[in-house]
């Protein structure tokens, strides 16, 4: 059993059963299938999802801040600040990802050379 414990109070927040090897393998396989599908999603759609994530973090900021405080023991003001930074980071990558991931032509001996960024898939 795994327990999530509030470090400030010692109160058990939740108890989790460990996964069997079969269940873990199934989850990794599902993640691999999802990664292949996700790799087909264009960068503008992904950027829009990051923007939606920023909005979600902001709309649920207090709930998530309370959860961080309970599970990690971080002061509430710091948890709120951390979530605000996460929302800003989502917006930053939403705005800049198309440029970061664009193919780049490079000078090389070959007739045509370029850098192309491709998803790695599931990383454990």
Which residues are covered by each model-predicted region?
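Structural motif
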Residues: 87, 120-121
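Solvent-exposed alpha-helices and their adjacent loops that cap or buttress functional pockets
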Residues: 115-119
């Amino acid at each position: 059993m795994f327990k999530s414990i509030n470090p400030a109070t010692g109160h058990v927040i939740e108890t989790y059963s460990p996964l069997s090897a079969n269940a873990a393998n199934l989850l990794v396989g599902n993640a691999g299938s999802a990664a292949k599908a996700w790799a087909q999603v264009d960068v503008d759609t992904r950027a829009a999802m990051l923007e939606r994530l920023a909005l979600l973090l902001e709309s649920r900021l207090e709930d998530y801040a309370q959860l961080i405080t309970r599970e990690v023991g971080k002061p509430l003001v710091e948890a709120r600040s951390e979530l605000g930074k996460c929302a800003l980071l989502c917006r930053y990558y939403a705005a800049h990802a198309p440029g970061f991931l664009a193919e780049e032509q490079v000078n090389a001996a070959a007739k045509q050379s370029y850098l192309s960024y491709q998803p790695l898939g599931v990383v454990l």
